[in-house]
């Protein structure tokens, strides 16, 4: 069995090592693979595959991978099921909600808050920054801004995130 990593994605050592340990060979190129590890996919990426070939993303998975689209989905669920989706801090999607964000941070209880700004379509922690309440933000970049959680859940005194890779 063999797998191929397309040039549309970052190469994760955890993925390569797991696949090799499972008996897969890494191909440089070609069509004779069982699995292609790639970036976001469309239906056009999936249609040409043979029945023995699999792909690591399903169409429209950008709704889970892009931070702005993910927040829109979470926000819709917060409206529908407020009790179950109260764990996410309030977030604004920029540039569309830039004015709303600027108005919110002028409120007295928001002036001492810090905010975390993340590019909408970045990964691996690239471009993330923490800003003070009065620091000016660009209204031109696709990003999300959330109230910074200053006392998050920690494991061994460290912040963490959970990622799941299913093979």
Mark where each language-model region is.
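ATP-binding N-terminal substructure of ATP-dependent carboxylate-amine bond-forming enzymes
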Residues: 1-80
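Active-site nucleotide/adenylate-binding loops and adjacent lid/helix of ATP-dependent enzymes
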Residues: 50-52, 58, 62-167
């Amino acid at each position: 069995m063999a797998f191929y990593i397309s040039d549309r994605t970052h190469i994760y050592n955890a993925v390569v090592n797991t696949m090799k340990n499972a008996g897969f060979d890494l191909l440089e190129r070609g069509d004779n693979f069982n699995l292609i590890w790639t970036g976001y996919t469309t239906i056009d990426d999936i249609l040409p595959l043979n029945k023995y070939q699999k792909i690591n993303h399903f169409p429209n998975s950008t709704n889970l991978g892009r931070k702005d689209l993910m927040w829109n989905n979470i926000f819709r669920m917060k409206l529908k099921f407020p009790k179950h989706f109260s764990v996410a801090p309030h977030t604004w999607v920029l540039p569309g909600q830039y004015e709303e964000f600027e108005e919110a941070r002028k409120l007295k209880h928001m002036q001492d808050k810090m905010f975390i700004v993340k590019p909408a379509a970045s990964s691996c922690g690239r471009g993330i920054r923490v800003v003070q309440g009065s620091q000016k933000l660009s209204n031109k970049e696709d990003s999300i801004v959330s109230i910074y959680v200053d006392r998050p859940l920690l494991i061994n005194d460290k912040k963490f995130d959970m990622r799941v890779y299913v093979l």
